[in-house]
Amino acid sequence: MDEKRLTHLRQLEAESIHIIREVAAEFSNPVMMYSIGKDSSVMLHLARKAFYPGSLPFPLLHVDTGWKFREMYEFRDRTAKAYGCELLVHRNPQGEALGINPFVHGSAKHTDIMKTEGLKQALDKYGFDAAFGGARRDEEKSRAKERIYSFRDRFHRWDPKNQRPELWHNYNGQINKGESIRVFPLSNWTELDIWQYIYLENIDIVPLYLAAPRPVLERDGMLLMVDDDRIDLQPGEVIEQRMVRFRTLGCWPLTGAVASEAQTLPEIIEEMLVSTTSERQGRVIDRDQAGSMELKKRQGYF
């Protein structure tokens, strides 16, 4: 294939499909992490293209905290059924028994127990030796320095000083028993690339990405959408209907919306063309402390 004849989106598509096929051929038990967001939707679309007309040679895994938006759960189940994918859902049973939640225990503890520990439990339970993730280098500085094949030790830890060279399109997937690789096929994509590709390929996404009147309250400089009756209202807080959408999706008490009138994909793309902030500004977990994402990744987070 002559890459010079491809548009930049088709070049990114070809690179991602190549990576996905390499992992499927090289590893004995891969899995695709499915967080239900826009990047997961693009990654799943690319995987289906990579093996069309066959089915995916690996399952999808959703590490569930119990605090995702209701529309995300509906979209997850509908998508898995429509595409005939094997969907594995894991919740940390110890965290559930302790009633861990973001309101009482805070974002750092909630994320560590329900997401990081939950992820490690699931990877160990099923014995996965490679796990696809939808992270991109433009999202956040610790992800910017991570390889496409991200080596993890037997405790699932990431050491940024112990990474393997990736020359051209050659990836080193050699691991010992108990070790694993996190694979990021979308590493070289930007947020704008993602939206342009979603528009180009008509990929289905969670409606929360499109602007609509939603019940929100202001807290710590963020707009939190009230998704169910578990909200812990603080003195002076008022729930009001505002026109908002989400640039990133996670646990609803930890994910901020943005004021927006973008109700269509072209309107979202127009917003991205003039945006000067990262989509991660809407994630409370990224504000826990300086370098919080890198610390979480060192402990086993995606």
UniProtKB/Swiss-Prot annotation:
Q: Which GO terms describe its molecular function?
A: ATP binding; sulfate adenylyltransferase (ATP) activity
Which SUPFAM superfamilies does the record associate with it? Adenine nucleotide alpha hydrolases-like
Under CDD domains, the record lists: Sulfate_adenylyltransferase_2
InterPro entries (UniProt xref)? PAPS_reduct_dom (IPR002500), Rossmann-like_a/b/a_fold (IPR014729), SO4_adenylTrfase_ssu (IPR011784), Sulfate_adenylyltrnsfr_sub2 (IPR050128)
Q: Which UniProt keywords apply?
A: ATP-binding, Nucleotide-binding, Nucleotidyltransferase, Transferase
Q: Which reaction does it catalyse?
A: sulfate + ATP + H(+) = adenosine 5'-phosphosulfate + diphosphate
Answer whether the UniProt record assigns the keyword GTP-binding to this protein: no
Q: What Pfam families does the record tag this protein with? A: PAPS_reduct
Enzyme superclass (EC) = transferase
Q: Which GO terms describe its biological process?
A: hydrogen sulfide biosynthetic process; sulfate assimilation
According to UniProt, this protein's pathway is:
Sulfur metabolism; hydrogen sulfide biosynthesis; sulfite from sulfate: step 1/3
Q: What is its EC number?
A: 2.7.7.4
Keyword Transferase set for record: yes
Q: How does it assemble?
A: Heterodimer composed of CysD, the smaller subunit, and CysN.
Q: What HAMAP family does this protein map onto?
A: Sulf_adenylyltr_sub2
Q: Which family does it belong to?
A: Belongs to the PAPS reductase family. CysD subfamily.
Q: What does this protein do?
A: With CysN forms the ATP sulfurylase (ATPS) that catalyzes the adenylation of sulfate producing adenosine 5'-phosphosulfate (APS) and diphosphate, the first enzymatic step in sulfur assimilation pathway. APS synthesis involves the formation of a high-energy phosphoric-sulfuric acid anhydride bond driven by GTP hydrolysis by CysN coupled to ATP hydrolysis by CysD.
Protein name per Swiss-Prot or TrEMBL: Sulfate adenylyltransferase subunit 2
Q: Which gene encodes it?
A: cysD
